[in-house]
């Protein structure tokens, strides 16, 4: 392949990485030169907005002096996952700026890529959990009152974080900084020990990390939309009124934004697998997949800074919480004294 994807630098030997310069498919050289200069700036911009936005969201949820609801527990974990994710983006921005010459050492090569990979799984699993929670509230409201517990939501989030860390373990173990003599660089690459690992990787990435969660998300949200459309105002009365509907609109928007941002990456990752097993060939496909992966990665990264924007512009209850936090943090002025009360205080003062 002529270049590597940000999340999965894929070559299993140096000859593949050397194809960056030696491949006969050199039609996209100008596009790559432009990408090396422009993409790092965009990634750093996403990092800045994602860092500030997710810190703001976490502050609003965690600083209010009241317990989180079940839905808010999931949203806090989603914001925390996005925050951890954007902390790794400056390393990748510098890596692209250096044309994949990794300057940060072997440990950060493993850690940064492991964190990014874990976030991919944690985010979509949280989307499934959030969708399932809304499904219970809207479609099975009576049962949800007995089953929805904060303790269960926290336990679910802990399991999701653990599974995400487990699925990112191969990335942490197989990533390393290797010298590429032809290019005179040291690249952070994924060294797969056997060709069969390519199949295992695509099953993990596309099936476990997208298709199965996508099926669950479509199932839950399809029933949610059908319930809202079929019950109308009656559903609001049964499930607790407009508050639940506002939360549902926010969550449906978050889910839709996540799928739109991440679907292109998974499509191009599958095309990359087809190219590796020679199911598709030719310079057109090579350039199309390589450039598409880079742009799809950038598009996926935007989701981490898009969620806080959705909270502000779509989440009415979130804006209410922002106002509550402002009032909580703003010192209250004492109420003005009436004239009779003022005279009574002065009389007691002079009497003493």
Curated annotation (Swiss-Prot):
Glycosites: 13, 21, 184
Any Pfam family hit: 7tm_1
Location of the protein in the cell: Cell membrane
Main location: membrane
GO biological process, one term: response to mechanical stimulus
Stored PROSITE patterns: G_PROTEIN_RECEP_F1_2 (PS50262)
Cysteine pairs bridged by disulfides in the record: 109-188
Membrane-spanning intervals of the chain: 42-62, 73-93, 111-131, 154-174, 207-227, 251-271, 295-315
GO MF entry, a single one: C-C chemokine receptor activity
Lipid modification (S-palmitoyl cysteine), residues: 329
Assigned GO CC terms: external side of plasma membrane
Stretches in topological domain Cytoplasmic: 63-72, 132-153, 228-250, 316-326
Membrane-protein topology: Multi-pass membrane protein
SUPFAM superfamilies assigned to the protein according to its UniProt record, in alphabetical order: Family A G protein-coupled receptor-like (SSF81321)
Organism superkingdom: Eukaryota
Ranges in the topological domain labelled Extracellular: 1-41, 94-110, 175-206, 272-294
Family that this chain belongs to: Belongs to the G-protein coupled receptor 1 family. Bradykinin receptor subfamily. BDKRB1 sub-subfamily.
Known function: This is a receptor for bradykinin. Could be a factor in chronic pain and inflammation.
Annotated protein name in UniProt: B1 bradykinin receptor
Source organism of the structure: Tupaia minor
Gene: BDKRB1
């Amino acid at each position: 392949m002529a270049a590597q994807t940000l999340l999965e630098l894929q070559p299993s030997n140096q000859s593949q990485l050397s194809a960056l310069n030696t491949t006969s498919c050199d039609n996209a050289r100008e596009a790559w030169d432009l990408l090396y200069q422009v993409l790092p700036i965009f990634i750093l911009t996403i990092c800045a907005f994602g860092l500030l936005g997710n810190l703001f969201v976490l502050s609003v949820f965690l600083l209010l002096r009241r317990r989180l609801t079940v839905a808010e527990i999931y949203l806090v974990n989603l914001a925390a996952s996005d925050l951890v994710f954007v902390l790794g983006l400056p390393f990748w921005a510098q890596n692209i700026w250096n044309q994949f010459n990794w300057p940060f050492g072997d440990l950060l090569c493993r850690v940064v890529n492991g964190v990014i990979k874990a976030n991919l799984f944690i985010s979509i699993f949280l989307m499934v959990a959030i969708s399932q929670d809304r499904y219970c509230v809207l479609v099975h409201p009576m049962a949800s009152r007995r089953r929805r517990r904060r303790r269960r939501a926290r336990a679910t989030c802990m399991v999701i974080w653990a599974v995400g860390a487990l699925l990112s373990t191969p990335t942490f173990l197989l990533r390393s900084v290797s010298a590429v003599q032809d290019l005179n660089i040291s690249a952070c690459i994924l060294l797969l020990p056997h060709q069969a690992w390519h199949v295992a990787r695509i099953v993990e990435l596309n099936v476990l990390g997208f298709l199965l969660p996508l099926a669950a998300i479509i199932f839950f949200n399809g029933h949610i939309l059908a319930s809202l459309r079929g019950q109308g105002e009656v559903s609001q009365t049964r499930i607790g009124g407009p508050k639940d509907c506002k939360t549902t609109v926010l969550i449906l928007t978050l889910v839709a934004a996540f799928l739109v941002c991440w679907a292109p990456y998974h499509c191009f990752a599958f095309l990359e697998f087809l190219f590796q097993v020679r199911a598709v060939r030719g310079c057109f496909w090579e350039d199309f997949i390589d450039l598409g992966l880079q742009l799809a990665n950038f598009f996926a990264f935007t989701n981490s800074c898009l969620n806080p924007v959705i909270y502000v512009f779509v989440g009415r209850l979130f804006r209410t919480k922002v106002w509550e936090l402002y009032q909580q943090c703003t010192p209250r002025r004492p109420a003005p004294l009436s004239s009779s009360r003022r005279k009574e205080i002065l009389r007691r003062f002079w009497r003493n």
